[in-house]
Regions:
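Membrane-interface amphipathic segments in extracytoplasmic regions
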Residues: 1-180
Length: 180
């Protein structure tokens, strides 16, 4: 999402409260700018991003994000966790919601973070208030859009599924400092 009024770019990570952020900017979703960099297509779009715009995104505990995506997607919600982890989607919306690691769209090919500020899902409102202060936008209470009803992520994992998970998402755990 790009917002020219506040000169900012929000990189939308799936299952990380992105819809709540987009709604907080009251953007016309029919405008093509709202989805600028929305799926982390960084090569061409990143280079053409307006100079001086504040870039931000949200990260989320990788285990919690995965469970949220797993339970959200119609194609996976009725499968067991071991089955989903053994056959992770490799393309399309299911890939973006479930399989793509968070770091894959937040770092460029040289390993540099491409945003100025990383919000944390776990401190969403506080971090959004900070972003608002930095860009000069009046603070606003975020809506809780697309919230699922499920157990705590730790209720789903055992030692085997944790190992399977870390083979694919361990870099997110390491880079963003999350603990199980």
């Amino acid at each position: 999402m790009i917002c020219h009024t506040y000169k900012c770019i929000f990189i939308h990570q799936r299952k990380c409260a992105g819809t709540s952020i987009i709604h907080a900017f009251d953007l016309d979703l029919s405008n093509p700018d709202w989805h600028f960099m929305n799926d982390g297509v960084l090569s061409r779009e990143y280079k053409s991003a307006p100079a001086g715009y504040f870039r931000f995104s949200i990260i989320r505990n990788p285990w919690d994000r995965f469970v949220s995506g797993w339970k959200y997607l119609a194609s996976t919600r009725d499968q067991s966790l071991p089955d989903v982890l053994a056959r992770l989607p490799r393309k399309g919306a299911d890939y973006r919601h479930l399989t793509r690691p968070q770091h894959a769209i937040l770092y460029d090919k040289h390993g540099r973070l491409i945003v100025d500020y990383l919000m944390r899902f776990e401190s969403l409102q506080r971090d959004f208030d900070r972003v608002c202060d930095l860009i000069g936008k009046p603070r606003r209470v975020l809506a809780r859009d697309n919230r699922g009803d499920r157990s705590h992520y730790a209720d789903y994992f055992d030692d085997d599924t944790r190992r399977m998970f870390l083979r694919h998402f361990g870099r997110d755990v390491e880079l963003f400092g999350y603990d199980y």
